[in-house]
Curated annotation (Swiss-Prot):
The lineage of its organism: Bacteria, Pseudomonadati, Pseudomonadota, Gammaproteobacteria, Enterobacterales. This is Dual-action ribosomal maturation protein DarP. Belongs to the DarP family. Disulfide bonds: none annotated. It comes from Escherichia coli O7:K1 (strain IAI39 / ExPEC). It is found in: Cytoplasm.
């Protein structure tokens, strides 16, 4: 057996390139699995969206076809299809998809908050009457005062008579129309 010289390691090709900026980042297998699972969950969120919401997310043709297929499949086949969608997402830039999905969620959350505010305003209209009507007219100057008073009066009668809250629903719908016409 021949003995190699001590400097044999110095002759490795490509070893003369010394760049400290090229650090190798090691990723654990567990982290890779967590990332894959997170992309699978993202795919499941996209699959659960309706057609109108799906149109607002930037997807290429292959991914969109896989998502539409997953929407039609049930049980075990759906699980396998979600794994395929997760795999497809790993090969793509998912940041635009995440941003579009967050935008959709945020729009839904804003709508829920608006509905809660309108419900509270409706309840105040029924309980307080003219004071709350003044608040509505400050928010929406084109609101019909007479229509509000009539509906409030009917809502109070329904509440006292333990009848279904038909007028209260009408007040809410009217307030929602005012809010939508404003924005």
């Amino acid at each position: 057996m021949t003995k190699q010289p001590e400097d044999w390691l110095d002759d490795v090709p490509g070893d003369d390139i010394e760049d400290e900026d090229d650090e190798i980042i090691w990723v654990s297998k567990s982290e890779i699995k967590r990332d894959a699972e997170e992309l699978k969950r993202l795919g499941a969120e996209i699959v659960d969206l309706g057609k109108n919401a799906l149109d607002k997310i930037p997807l290429d043709a292959d991914l969109r076809a896989a998502i539409e297929l997953a929407q039609r499949i049930k049980m075990e086949g759906r699980r396998r299809q979600l794994q395929l969608i997760g795999k497809m997402l790993r090969q793509r830039d998912v940041e635009p998809i995440r941003q579009a999905l967050d935008k959709l969620k945020n729009r839904h959350n804003q709508q829920v908050v608006l509905f809660h505010k309108l419900e509270n305003l409706r309840d105040r209209l029924i309980d307080q009457g003219d004071d709350a009507i003044a608040e509505v007219l400050n928010l929406w100057p084109d609101a019909d005062r007479q229509q509000l008073r009539t509906r409030i009066r009917n809502a109070k009668k329904e509440k006292e008579g333990n009848k279904p809250p038909k007028s209260a629903r009408q007040i809410f719908q009217y307030l929602r129309e005012l809010a939508e016409n404003e924005g």
